[in-house]
Amino acid sequence: MRGISSASKNKIHELIDDLFDRMALQLVGEIPSLRNKKSIIFTSKPNLTLAHIFLKTLGSERPLPQEREALKNLLSTAEEYISSLRAKTKAQMTEKIDSYVKEQHLKNQRPSTVDIKSIINENLEKAKSHFKTIAEAESTKARNMGKALQIGKVAASQGVSDPNVYFVVVRDGKTCSECVRLHLMPDLVTPRVWKLSEIGFGYHKKGENNPKIAGLHCRCRCSLAFLAPGFGFKNGQVAWIGEGHDEYRAQRGQQ
């Protein structure tokens, strides 16, 4: 039973590699596997990369050793997700085209170029959609990771060992129930305050009772923020309450 040739498989893989190299460059930046592809390197947008997002929220272009290590791990994780999706896309597209060609030969019919192009386009669009999900999730993680490190430094300069933090919620029709539950008070207006030490660094599972640096779902848009001592909220906005005020304790009936 005749399927597609090795040469055809290689062409499919090259097509997928070109797509993923372009997308990875926009998200991760210039990584070793892309350095010889000057045609796409010059089309990149550095201000959209995870490194830029991380450094912008960190507030420093010269990160400390531990901050550089955090960024390195962030980029490494993103590359692993991209590599996994790349391999999956190659396998799925090759299998679908190969199956189609074999079915046509069994019917004594010539494979249609139009049908093959349709299979290719369908799988490329699917890959782009999945990549977008990865990009959104990893960008949220980069933004909040950089902010968490920046908050830690600012708090330390004020003599605060475990600072109060909250999440700025994007409130629209896409705001999920989990973001409302963990990021807002019952009045649905006042941000819920947490200690930085309570924020998880792994991925969130629905029903868990603490927020996460990486967000509460793959398309989470909530951003971590610092609440300085003495500050609280009025009508959902940060406001000075008074010397000695601790919003974390106040929300829990401890003040």
Go through each PLM region and give its residues:
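N-terminal leader/targeting and assembly helices and adjacent pre-domain segments
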Residues: 1-132, 139, 150, 226-255
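Acidic, glycine-rich two-metal-ion catalytic cores of nucleic acid-processing enzymes
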Residues: 125-237
